[in-house]
Amino acid sequence: MEYRSLTLDDFLSRFQLLRPQINRETLNHRQAAVLIPIVRRPQPGLLLTQRSIHLRKHAGQVAFPGGAVDDTDASVIAAALREAEEEVAIPPSAVEVIGVLPPVDSVTGYQVTPVVGIIPPDLPYRASEDEVSAVFEMPLAQALHLGRYHPLDIYRRGDSHRVWLSWYEQYFVWGMTAGIIRELALQIGVKP
């Protein structure tokens, strides 16, 4: 697939045809969810945030809107939608959820479910001053180009762990966020 020519229809048909295989086994029992917001355009965008430098965990990192599932959430999808509204003012009613990717175990002890949703192009994003320092949109075709991600093998607590690294403009995209974007690319059939 030529990544420069990815349309929203191409993305949707590939995502719907190749449904993710969900592995129910997990090392972590605390649940979290992130929204992967795909901006509805002829050439779609991928909405990302940069976390505030004042946060205790993952300060300054590029991330999808999301967080822990709490007692008021009916599901991981509800948690992702709630967090997106809290962090960047995306109303849950504006998100067309098209599916989820397999959960990812985080280094902070959460099982994170990526929820894929389509959002309108004209939403007035407002970053939560406490949690988000920037909101930006990356062309989806560029985000899903696997050649932009570089592996780094690190050792943590005696175990080898692979993280993925990339840049977009002034933003350093790495770790779980880069891994989720790569998983989305693989899910729609992009070849390494």
Curated annotation (Swiss-Prot):
* Keyword flag Magnesium: yes
GO MF terms held by the record: coenzyme A diphosphatase activity; magnesium ion binding; manganese ion binding
UniProt cross-references to InterPro entries, sorted A to Z: CoAse, NUDIX_hydrolase-like_dom_sf, NUDIX_hydrolase_dom, NUDIX_hydrolase_NudL_CS, Nudix_NudL
**Keyword set, alphabetical order:** Hydrolase, Magnesium, Manganese, Metal-binding
The record places domain Nudix hydrolase at: 29-160
Pfam families for this protein: NUDIX
Task: Specify which residues bind Mg(2+) according to the UniProt entry for this protein.
Answer: 83, 87
Q: Does the entry feature the keyword Magnesium, yes or no?
A: yes
Cofactor(s) for this protein?
Answer: Mn(2+); Mg(2+)
This entry's Enzyme Commission designation comes to: 3.6.1.-
Q: Which CDD domains match?
A: NUDIX_CoAse_Nudt7 (cd03426)
* Entries under PROSITE patterns matching the protein: NUDIX, NUDIX_COA
Fetch the Gene3D superfamilies from UniProt. Answer: Nucleoside Triphosphate Pyrophosphohydrolase
Question: Which example biological process does GO assign this protein?
Answer: nucleoside diphosphate metabolic process
The UniProt annotation puts motif Nudix box at: 67-89
What does this chain do? Probably mediates the hydrolysis of some nucleoside diphosphate derivatives.
* Entry similarity comment: Belongs to the Nudix hydrolase family. PCD1 subfamily.
Name under which the protein is recorded: Uncharacterized Nudix hydrolase NudL
Q: Which organism is it from?
A: Escherichia coli O1:K1 / APEC
